[in-house]
Amino acid sequence: MEKTTIPAHLIKRFHQLGVDNAFGIVGDYALRLFAELSHRGFPVLVTTDEQGAGFAADAFARVRGFGVVATTYGVGGLKVANAAANAWAEQVPLLILSGAPGVIEREGEPMLHHRVKDFDTQLRVFRELTCAQGVLNSPHNAATEIDRVIRTMRSTQRPGYIEVPRDAVMWDIDDSDDNIDPRLPPVDLAAQREAIMAVLNQLRSHDSAAIHAGAMIQRRNLGSSLYDLATSLGIPVATSSLARGTFPERHELGLGVYLGALSPEHVVQRVEGADVLLSLGVLQTDLTLGVFTAKIDHHRLILATDNDVTVGYSTFKDVPLWSFLPALVEAAHLDAQHAESINISHEPIPAHPTFEPVETNNTVERTVAALESHLDSRHSLLLDPGEALFSAVDMRVPTYAHASAYYATMGYAVPAALGVGTADPQRRPVVVVGDGAFSMTGLDVASCAFHNVNAIFVVLDNGGYGTQRPIIDGPFNDIPSLAVEHLPSVIGCGRGWKVDTEVELDGALRDAIASNEVCLIRVILATDARSPALTRLGAALAAKA
């Protein structure tokens, strides 16, 4: 049997997956691993914090289909736990690659630094947060363990964990030619044919339909099938907040994002008022359904998940989305005359939104409108949880919008810009983030600059945690005011602006878009500033009370 090393085998697999770098912070238990990866042409891009490295790798995975965060043992690995939790909740194949104390030096249970209860504490934590774990403590199965973890991650679209003892890095290990292709959920072809007939019968017998597309469309690489289905049958498409960009929002059939009562009225009417609603790969969570303000009649619902299809109250088992949607598209092409009976009339949107600034103080609504007018296909949007995420439901994004939209971990978007910018260098990341979240991970602006990702950061500064103030206000929602517009000067590159008015905001956005360096715009808002989306949500929740 041929021999290899752990770093060489990892890199071989990463390159097969289209991954050409990791993100992370080195420590002594991971020094040799990092050195070997770098020496072999696989760099680990340094961030300011391990959690930020995890967010960057998560965002990279959302674009490329797989991401790697590398860290040291204990103090590094446990700081990545929150990023792993985010990846589990939102079904992202994020690999946590951790250095660890050597196999030999663990003998006798010595009290080595970074150890907690015992040497397996970190492993037990990640058993709760990942779909597969591998500790590479034998040269005979190290390669097959790597392959098993990667294959399971790709099959489930969940994070995985690999631990590399530092004395194992240069072992000669048995090579592996195992197949790392995902083992997709099984298909009952007879049930699938029945499900497709049931769906087409529903569409034929009703006057209007809509599609609600979710994260699993992107995770299973089904964007082209979604587009074909919508355009062949003339069905308008709304996406979930976890799937923005899987269907072009500025297309004539694009509705934007459906988020229950948070969404604009015309989106709510088209989705909730459709005679038939096809929910394709949507994670049915509280936040993706507008804190459960979505009003969807299950008699009219067709629900396609990663495992089953439900039409009304009939469930077709073992009909997974990855097989069902392409087969439905094929059947729909044969049934294309049905397109004429679908009511697709809705207000067309301009090819490019316009914004006319006036000399008045900034509001959340007008800030979003200004930003939308400057975005185009050259940009990727990143939205941090809170008002940055909610306010953007009134925006038609030109490409993709990435967010921790279900797990909702604050501080995600700034380091995620590094991941998105690295994974898709043809598009410039534009980040919208609140001042509270920016105070958590804002230093990763420096990481972006250091790695030549010249992102634009728009910081919504309302003096604290504005999303929570309408729920229960108090001094716990107030935070120190930081002059973050000076951060580019601190890191020695880029430009910064503080803008109080619409005219200043529009000018700063215009200059930032035209520049080729890191830019940071601090948008001053009133303490009680609130987006129309948050106002709509408050009214809906009050009506339910």
Residue ranges and their predicted role:
Residues 280, 304-305, 383, 434-435, ...:
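Active-site flanking residues adjacent to catalytic metal/cofactor-binding acidic residues
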Residues 93, 107-117, 390-545:
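Thiamine diphosphate
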Residues 1-336, 454-457:
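N-terminal alpha/beta PP-like core and its mobile active-site loop of ThDP/TPP-dependent enzymes
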Residues 1-2, 137-140, 176, 296-385, ...:
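Phosphate/pyrophosphate-binding active-site segments
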Residues 247, 387, 434:
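Active-site segments that bind and position negatively charged phosphate/pyrophosphate groups
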Residues 58, 124, 227, 369, ...:
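Active-site phosphate/pyrophosphate- and oxyanion-stabilizing loops and adjacent acidic/basic residues
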Residues 52-53, 79, 122, 324, ...:
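Catalytic-loop motifs flanking and including active-site residues across diverse enzymes
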